């Protein structure tokens, strides 16, 4: 459920999207604020719980957010178990790539937060949970559009282009609308091509 009409792309008569994400939260702080408790009141049998963390979990400067990769597993299991207890299907999604090409030796984009991605893949195998590797897919995509193309996806804004950012902005973490649509399209494509088991078949049918 989105407050922005332009963001409603993949909802259908048979699939309602309730976006419970909150900016600046990690798997730890989201839980500590009681947001999982709120989610548990809404989720029901037959639902899917897609979860993506890591950007804030890896931030050692924010004690209330930071978790080690090992603690990351502990927190993700709380979300996984909450979904299962209510007859819903948990789905893990690796964190999208950041615009890091300015910091890599070869100027290429890389998978962000690799230790957390690896842990999520491990959790998927260990507990038989579907994993959508959006982290790798977005890094690969950014390498196709390149340095300049990536600026049109992330919040690289010219001075005066937007009223809310009169001085412009250079943000390598957050997406513009074009980036959000591109990455959502990648996610939808990965769901459509998921063939490890039949756990996502209901969503795949709605995206067909």
Q: What positions do the PLM features span?
A:
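Short, solvent-exposed mixed-charge patches
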Residues: 207-208
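Alpha-helical cap/lid subdomain in secreted, periplasmic
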Residues: 34-177, 181, 185-204
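Serine-esterase "nucleophile elbow" of acetyl-processing enzymes
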Residues: 1-21, 37-45
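Acidic/histidine-rich helix-loop elements
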Residues: 1, 19-33, 60-67
């Amino acid at each position: 459920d989105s407050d922005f009409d332009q963001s409603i792309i993949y909802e259908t008569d048979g699939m309602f999207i309730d976006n419970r994400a909150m900016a600046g939260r990690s798997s730890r702080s989201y839980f500590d604020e009681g947001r999982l408790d709120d989610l548990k009141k809404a989720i029901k049998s037959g639902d899917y719980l897609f979860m993506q963390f890591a950007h804030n979990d890896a931030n050692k400067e924010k004690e209330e957010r930071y978790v080690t990769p090992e603690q990351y597993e502990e927190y993700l299991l709380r979300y996984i178990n909450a979904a299962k207890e209510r007859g819903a299907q948990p789905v893990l999604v690796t964190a999208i790539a950041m615009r890091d090409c300015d910091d890599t030796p070869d100027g290429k984009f890389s998978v962000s937060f690799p230790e957390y991605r690896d842990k999520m893949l491990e959790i998927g195998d260990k507990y038989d949970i579907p994993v959508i590797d959006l982290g790798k897919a977005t890094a690969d995509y950014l390498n196709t559009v390149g340095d300049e193309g990536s600026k049109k996806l992330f919040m690289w804004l010219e001075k005066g282009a937007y009223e809310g950012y009169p001085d412009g902005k250079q943000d390598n973490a957050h997406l513009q609308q074009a980036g959000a649509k591109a990455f959502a399209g990648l996610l939808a494509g990965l769901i459509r091509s998921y063939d490890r088991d039949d756990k996502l078949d209901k969503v795949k049918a709605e995206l067909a």
